[in-house]
Swiss-Prot record:
The keyword Zinc does not apply. This is Large ribosomal subunit protein bL21c. Keywords: Chloroplast, Plastid, Ribonucleoprotein, Ribosomal protein, RNA-binding, rRNA-binding. Signal peptide: none annotated. It comes from Staurastrum punctulatum (Green alga). Pfam families: Ribosomal_L21p. The keyword Acyltransferase does not apply.
Length: 114
């Protein structure tokens, strides 16, 4: 059984494993992040290691997930089209969400690397 953790990041919950890549939504400009910057997630909801499961209420104490920013990126453009019937008017807008691609390096619980 692989070791994994469930963390809260970017307003959503993610199941993460060491050595894998993930995209997390950001609410800050891309210019504030740079490549290979270390990042630590302390909001760990659950850790599963071999046959042991640790649950937090709501978060686990002394649990962290360490990772590195691989690169910031922007998602595909979403088109919002609003049309008012019988008025012959419409409005078209676009939006691109900012993401941060990161790689998870390790999962720590009680100062032990799992």
């Amino acid at each position: 059984m692989n070791t994994y953790a469930i963390i809260e990041a970017g307003g959503e919950q993610l199941q993460v494993q060491p050595g894998r890549f993930y995209d997390i939504r950001l609410n800050v400009p891309v210019t504030e992040f740079w490549e290979n910057r270390k990042i630590v997630f302390s909001r760990v909801l659950m850790i599963r290691s071999e046959s042991n499961t640790f649950l937090g209420k709501p978060w686990l104490e002394h649990a962290t997930v360490n990772g590195r920013i691989f690169h910031p990126r922007r998602g595909n453009k979403l088109i919002i089209y609003k049309m008012r019937p019988k008025k012959h008017t419409s409005k078209k807008n676009g939006h691109r969400q900012t993401f941060m691609r990161l790689i998870i390096d390790s999962i720590f619980f009680n100062n032990q690397n799992l």
